[in-house]
């Protein structure tokens, strides 16, 4: 194992909150492999880069020699996590959950080492609780405590219904930590209430409380909202290499550093050197290319990463796209013709429609086919003719 100082530095990389750090240091000083848990309810079949932020941290614990368990919430997935929701989630069938779980396993092993990963399902112990066990579990908390949760508080104040089983969700997730005697649990910042519930239940059951490590939510391609499919600002881990490459290259230079910190496995010293290089005048685009290739190689292959880079170069570099160009931001739902006019690439929507019809308007190197089309959320390079360019963000 690495020294405690080196291990702690790697563990804390990109972390939003660590509760409490002194307990983690004490556990590391015990010199044994710690039991690390990450739970996920398989509510959707595919994961995107936002999901991988925590998986990367789990991999870091593996590389440091700790015992890692990826817990699939097949039981809690049928209950439905109410976190951040303003209405009750529709329950999933067991068939839905198990089908999604199989896809999850295939995708997480692109990051985690299969030989060092234990996969468990929480139905193993939650199904055995029975009515008496559920009542005893519920007795650990009060309705007042549950209403401290921001999402429950808002729904209660707004007269929105809260189902009784939703109150049980944090307790069930917390009980997972009791059943597994977890040392450290990972989660997103939106999971704080549930993660701390694990600490409380472990104390109530005579166990040492787990350390809670929370990772920030990855900002999506729009540079504003968290990455999600609903916001259409995501990069799926199963997307084609060329699609992934183009999307990563579209993020802002400032956002690139956040992606490096949360998605890259490069040493911290190397990232510091990258920042120094950019400060000294190196083009951030070159650094962004390395990020895109690293991520594509992880989910596809190095050959795919090289091919995606070459395709990108062929599409953009040969069009002689300038590094500097006007930048604009428009709301989602804006038609192509309006974008071209408002970005001053055309004098009017009529001219914009004419340019599209003539094949003279391009978006990311591809001809715009429909002047009424509405681009998805993201950042694109628009070109009209040979010399007019604009970088447009749809948010």
From Swiss-Prot:
User: Pfam family of this protein, just one?
Assistant: tRNA-synt_1b
Any one of the GO BP annotations: tyrosyl-tRNA aminoacylation
The segment(s) forming the S4 RNA-binding domain are 334-394
Q: What does this protein do?
A: Catalyzes the attachment of tyrosine to tRNA(Tyr) in a two-step reaction: tyrosine is first activated by ATP to form Tyr-AMP and then transferred to the acceptor end of tRNA(Tyr).
> HAMAP family per the record?
Tyr_tRNA_synth_type2
Quaternary structure and interacting proteins, as annotated: Homodimer.
Protein's name according to its UniProt entry? Tyrosine--tRNA ligase 2
**Species annotation:** Vibrio vulnificus (strain YJ016)
- What gene is behind this protein? tyrS2
């Amino acid at each position: 194992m690495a020294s405690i100082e080196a291990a702690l530095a790697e563990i804390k990389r990109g972390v939003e909150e660590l509760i409490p750090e002194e307990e983690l240091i004490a556990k590391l000083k015990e010199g044994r492999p710690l039991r690390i848990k990450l739970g996920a309810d398989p509510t959707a079949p595919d994961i995107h880069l936002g999901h991988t932020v925590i998986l990367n941290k789990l991999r870091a614990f593996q590389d440091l020699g700790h015992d890692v368990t990826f817990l699939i919430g097949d039981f809690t997935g049928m209950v439905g996590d109410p976190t951040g929701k303003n209405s009750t989630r529709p329950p999933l069938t067991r068939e839905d959950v198990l089908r999604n779980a199989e896809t999850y396993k295939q995708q997480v092993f692109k990051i985690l080492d299969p030989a060092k990963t234990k996969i468990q399902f929480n139905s193993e112990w939650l199904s055995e609780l029975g009515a008496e066990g559920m009542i005893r579990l519920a007795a650990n908390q009060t309705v007042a405590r549950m209403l401290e949760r921001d999402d429950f508080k808002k729904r209660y104040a707004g007269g929105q219904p809260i189902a009784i089983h939703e109150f049980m969700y944090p307790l069930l997730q917390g009980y997972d930590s009791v059943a597994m005697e977890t040392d450290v649990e990972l989660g997103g910042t939106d999971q704080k209430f549930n993660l701390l519930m694990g600490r409380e239940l472990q104390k109530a059951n005579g166990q040492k409380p787990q350390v809670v490590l929370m990772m920030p939510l990855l900002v999506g391609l729009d540079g504003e909202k968290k990455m999600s499919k609903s916001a259409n600002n995501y990069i799926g881990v199963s997307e084609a290499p060329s699609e992934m490459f183009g999307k990563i290259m579209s993020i802002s230079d400032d956002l690139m550093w956040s992606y490096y910190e949360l998605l890259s496995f490069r040493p911290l010293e190397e990232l510091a050197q990258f920042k120094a290089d950019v400060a000294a005048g190196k083009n951030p685009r070159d650094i962004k290319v390395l990020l895109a290739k690293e991520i594509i190689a992880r989910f596809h292959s190095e050959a795919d990463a090289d091919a995606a880079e070459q395709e990108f170069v062929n599409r953009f570099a040969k069009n002689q796209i300038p590094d500097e160009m006007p930048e604009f931001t428009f709301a989602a739902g804006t038609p192509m013709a309006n974008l071209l006019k408002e970005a001053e690439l055309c004098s009017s929507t009529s001219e914009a429609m004419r340019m599209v019809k003539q094949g003279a308007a391009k978006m990311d190197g591809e001809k715009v086919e429909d002047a009424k089309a509405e681009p998805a959320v993201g950042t694109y390079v628009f070109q009209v003719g040979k010399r007019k360019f604009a970088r447009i963000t749809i948010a």
